[in-house]
From Swiss-Prot:
Record gene name: accA
Protein name, as recorded: Acetyl-coenzyme A carboxylase carboxyl transferase subunit alpha
GO molecular function: acetyl-CoA carboxylase activity; ATP binding; carboxyl- or carbamoyltransferase activity
Pathway(s) this gene product operates in, as recorded in its UniProt entry: Lipid metabolism; malonyl-CoA biosynthesis; malonyl-CoA from acetyl-CoA: step 1/1
Compartment(s) where it occurs, according to its Swiss-Prot or TrEMBL record: Cytoplasm
Organism expressing this protein natively: Shigella sonnei (strain Ss046)
Enzyme class: transferase
Domain of life assignment: Bacteria
Residue intervals of the CoA carboxyltransferase C-terminal domain: 35-296
Amino acid sequence: MSLNFLDFEQPIAELEAKIDSLTAVSRQDEKLDINIDEEVHRLREKSVELTRKIFADLGAWQIAQLARHPQRPYTLDYVRLAFDEFDELAGDRAYADDKAIVGGIARLDGRPVMIIGHQKGRETKEKIRRNFGMPAPEGYRKALRLMQMAERFKMPIITFIDTPGAYPGVGAEERGQSEAIARNLREMSRLGVPVVCTVIGEGGSGGALAIGVGDKVNMLQYSTYSVISPEGCASILWKSADKAPLAAEAMGIIAPRLKELKLIDSIIPEPLGGAHRNPEAMAVSLKAQLLADLADLDVLSTEDLKNRRYQRLMSYGYA
C-alpha cells in the first residue's frame, strides 16, 4: 500500500521516496556494480528512527490530523481483522438504512457479540454513500434497534466510534436528529448487557456519544474525542478556522488528557506511525483490549452494570 504522508511527516516522506527510487533502480538493473541493498537498509533504519523521533512529540493538532487520515482503518476493517462470521443487519424499521452506521452479529474469539460502528468510506462514491461517516437519525435508530436485540439475546455490545459528528442537514433535523441521539443516550445507560466503546478515529460531539455510553470506553492512541472540531471551536472563538491548531491544544481532545480527566478507561497503543501503517497489528492490540474488558465485565450482574454505568455518567463534570 502506498502511504499518504501528512505535512508534519514530510521528512519521512522524503526518505521513503529515496528508498522507493533505489528499489526501483535495483529492479531495473540487477547488474549494477553497487550495493543498493545495503543503502536501502541504512535508509530504512534512518526512516524508522526519524518516525520514532517525530511521533514521540506530537501535538494535539497533529494527532487530530492522524485521527482523520484517509488510510486509517475503519469499523469494517477491524470487523474483518479481529472478528469472525460477521453478519450485517440493516435498517431502522421505520425510515431507511443509514450507511454511515454499520452493525451486525459477529464472533469475538468464538463468542457472539453485537458490533455497531461509524463507517466513513474511502473512495469518493463510497464516501458519499456513507455520508462521510455522519449519521442521520435513522442511523442512530438502527444502532438502538441492534442494541435492544443484543440485550434480548444476552450478547455484549461493542461499538466503534469514528465520526466528525451527526449529520446537521435539514432533513435530518426534520426527522428528529436530537431526539434520536438523546434516546440512545438514555437507552444505552439502561442496557443490561456489557457495552464496550472504542474511539478509533474522530469522536465528534453528540454524533459520537450516541453510540458511546458504555461500561468501558477506550481510545486508540492517535484518536480524538471532543464536543466540537478544532476548526469549529476556532471559528467561534477567533472567527477563523486557521486557529484550529491553537484550539486543538486548548480543548484537551487527545487520549492522555481524557484519561487524566477520567472520561476514558484505556488508551490502546498504535503501531509506529499510526494504525494505518499496520492495520493487522492494530487489530491484534484492539482485540486483546476488547477481550480483557469483557472479562472484567462478565463477573458483574445486570444491576451492577446499570448502576456502575449510571454512576459513571453522573460523575462527568466533577473534579
